Amino acid sequence: MEGGLRTGRLPKAPELSLQSFPSEWSWVWTYPLFHKLAAFACHASQAWLTVGITSESREGPNGLLDTLASLYHTSSTSEQKQMTVLVHLADSDPTWLRRTIIRISSLYRSQILTGQLLLIHAPPDAYPAVNDAQNKVSRGQIYSKQNVDHAFLMSFATKLSTYFLLIEDNVFCAPNFVNHIRSKVGYRKPNTWVLLEFSNMGFLGKLLHSRDLPLLAHFLLLFHKERPLNWLLLHFRTLLGQQSSILCRPFLFYHRLTHLTFENKTLIGHEKDPPDPYTLSGTVYTDMRFSDTHSPQEAYTLDESFFWSYNVTTGNYLTVILNNPANLNRVQVRTGSITDGKYILEKGQVELGYDPEGTPPQCTSFTLLGRLVQGQMDQFILESIGYKVSCVKLAVNANQVGGLMIRHIYIWGENAKNRKDVQIDNDDDDDDDDYDDDS
C-alpha cells in the first residue's frame, strides 16, 4: 500500500452524541453489581487491545459463555493484561440479562474487578425507530439492530485501548491469539492500514485502530438500515483509503456450530436454526493419495478426525455422494491445521452436483457454489441451486506440494423426499462483496 491512510478522506463527522443519550455514559445500563464498573471504565488505564462482542438471547447453548471461556483459556496471563473484553448485552429481556450477568460475574469475578471484563447494555428507547409497512421483520430492521448494537459497542470502546478487535458470541480462538495479532501489527506501520482481518467470515476477527471507532460508529448509525455490518465495515475501510482486504494468516477465530450468526439468519431468509450438520448419510470418494490412517470418509464426520493427503494436483477432488438427493441450505469446508494454518488447500472450489448415474454413482452436472478463501468456505445456498443435490465436491484448482489436511465438510439440509416443492424467489438481488487477499 502506498503512503499513509487518513480519516480525513471522509467528511468530518461529529462525535457520537445521539439525542437519545442524555449524557456521555447515560445509555449504559448496568446490573447493580456493576454500577461502579461504568465509572471505572471512564478512568481505567488503556489496554493494548479491546475485544468487542455483542450478544443476545437465543435458543440452545449459551455461546457467549463458551466464547469467553475460549478467550481466557487460549490467552496467557501476560496477554490478558494487555486485553480488555467488552461485552454489549444487546437483548431487552430482563430475565436473560440478569441471568447472563449473574452467570458471568460468578465465573469471571477477578476479571471484572480488575477491569479486564466490562458488560454494558443500551436500553431499547436508545434505538432509532425503523418503520416497516408489513407486519413482519424486514431486512432493514435486522440490519438496523445489528448496526446500532455495534455502534454502541464501538462508542464505548473508543478510549479503552489502542486497538479494537471485533468478534462474535459463538466463536473459539486460536492459542495465544493476542501475541499473534501483536506480531502482525508490528510488521505494519500504523498509518498504512485501516482494517486487518484475522478471519474470512463476515465481521468476525476484524481489527481496527481505536482512534477510528467514533467515526465508524457514526458511519454505522448513518446507514443503519441500508446494509449489514460486514458490508459497511468493508465500505468504511475503502472510504478511509485501504482499497484491498488484508487477510492475516493463520486465521485465529472460527465459528462454533451451535447456531447461526445474526447476520446469516438474515441472508437465508428465516429465523430458525438449520438442522445439525451431517444429518444426511453419504459416501466420500477421492482420487487423491491417502492412507488407512486418515481415510476420505473422515472428512465427513463431526469428530476431530480429518482426511490427509499430499502433493495434490489440478483436477483432484474429494466428493461426498449422498445416499438420497437433498435440499441443502449451507455448506462449510475447513482445511488446514487450526493452530498454525498449515496444510490448507491453497486454491480450490466447492461444487454442487445433480442427477447421479452409474455404479458407484457419479453426478452428471455440477454448479459452482464458491471458491475457498485461505483454505476455508462457509456458504449459504439459494434454493434455486440447493434443490435435489446429490454431490458436494471439493475440487483442487492448482498443483500443491506437501501435505493437505481436510478437517471437515459439513452440510445442512434435509432429504428432498421429505420436503414440499420449492418455490424459488428471485426478487432478492442484494449484492455480496468479494474479498481480495492482500496479505
Curated annotation (Swiss-Prot):
InterPro entries: Glyco_transf_54, MGAT4_A/B/C_C. Keywords: Glycosyltransferase, Transferase. The keyword Lipoprotein does not apply. Pfam families: MGAT4_cons, MGAT4A_C. Disulfide bonds: none annotated. The keyword Phosphoprotein does not apply. This is Alpha-1,3-mannosyl-glycoprotein 4-beta-N-acetylglucosaminyltransferase-like protein MGAT4E. It comes from Mus musculus. The gene is Mgat4e.
